[in-house]
Amino acid sequence: MSKRFPVDVILQHNIDGTIIPIRLRFTSEEGERQEYTIKGYRDLSGQETRTMPDGVYVIGSDLVYQCKLLVNKEQRMVYLHRKSDGSSWFMTVIK
């Protein structure tokens, strides 16, 4: 299972009910605060109950996004997951 990092997520809530992740912020393992604008995403929410490639078990009502970030001029892919109770978000890095 991939390591989970707690993140703050800025979201756009559209009139049609869709939710778009815009930015994320987290504290690195070195204790440094980092912020990234999401350059692209795929909404993987609302699908069947399953285990994601990062090892996280999700159900159909969970919010899950695969997001593209630009980190030190390199493209990185991450999964964003909202905890089932809706209290917080975490990210896992896709290798």
Model-inferred region functions:
Residues 1-95:
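Cysteine-centric segments in proteins
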